[in-house]
Regions:
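N-terminal segments that mediate ammonia production and transfer
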Residues: 1-243
Length: 244
């Protein structure tokens, strides 16, 4: 048997994260894509870290296309007028639990949106089931909201609009260190958190709604090796996932 080369010892290797994707190659949006992607991540427990009690995960998440059918329905209930498909962008926010700080952050974001020449449409509190979480995840759980921004008529759909949203996000990040923008785009949205693999589906009500339809879904289960788990550090990271 050959010995170790240098300082490398294969016995000290660690597992890394789990990743997966589901794509409808014809571009047809269905809820089946959401369900299949969630099923993938639920089968990646061997690629997902958790605490010693086995009740809090290192992080699990999913990236999806924005489902106009779904958001038109839920925004109508909130009296948020989002317009036609791809005529708006959505931000997913992890706000502080403290109400005063949260309201200050929201006001700051709305001010920056107006400063950049865009119109803010409204806020939606994301419905969640925090009772499925382990104590550690629940104790540091953020206040999760979605913010809606109208696409200006002089800005093209897709990448051009996303570039303007990117500038807004970067400016906001310089002004607020206590709020984390999970995603901000006119095309995609990220749902993630400090979950076990089976908690992503049950935590977010949005993911269980048959009207949430997408042609693309990417999932990630995190296995922390050199950084502590947190809500922010869960993947996907707005555009990509990686397994270390």
């Amino acid at each position: 048997m050959k010995g170790n080369k240098g300082l490398y010892c294969p016995m000290l290797e660690h597992d890394n994260c789990g990743i997966g994707a589901v794509v409808n190659i014809k571009g047809k949006k269905t809820h089946q894509v959401v369900s299949q992607a969630l099923e993938i991540v639920e089968n990646l427990e061997h690629r997902a870290g958790k605490d010693a009690e086995g009740k809090t995960g290192d992080g699990v998440g999913i990236l999806l296309q924005i489902s106009h059918r779904f958001f038109k329905k839920v925004c109508l209930k909130e009296q948020i007028l989002i317009g036609d498909d791809r005529e708006y962008g959505i931000g997913m926010f992890f706000f502080p639990a403290d109400e005063l700080t949260r309201n200050q952050s929201r006001k700051m974001f709305e001010t920056i949106v107006a400063k950049e020449g865009l119109r803010f449409l409204g806020w939606r509190k994301v419905p969640v089931h925090e009772d499925v979480l382990g104590k550690k995840a629940r104790d540091c759980m953020p206040y999760i909201m979605q913010g809606f921004i109208e696409k200006p008529s002089d800005t093209a759909k897709g990448l051009e609009f996303d570039r303007r949203l990117y500038a807004i996000r970067r400016e906001f990040e310089q002004s607020s260190t206590e709020t984390y923008i999970v995603s901000l785009s006119g095309r995609t949205i990220v749902y993630k958190g400090m979950f076990l693999v089976g908690q992503l589906r049950t935590f977010f009500e949005d993911l269980q709604d048959p009207d949430y339809q997408t042609a693309i879904a990417m999932v990630h289960s995190r296995f922390s090796t050199n950084t502590e788990p947190s809500w922010n550090r869960a993947h996907p990271n707005r555009f990509i996932v990686h397994n270390g």
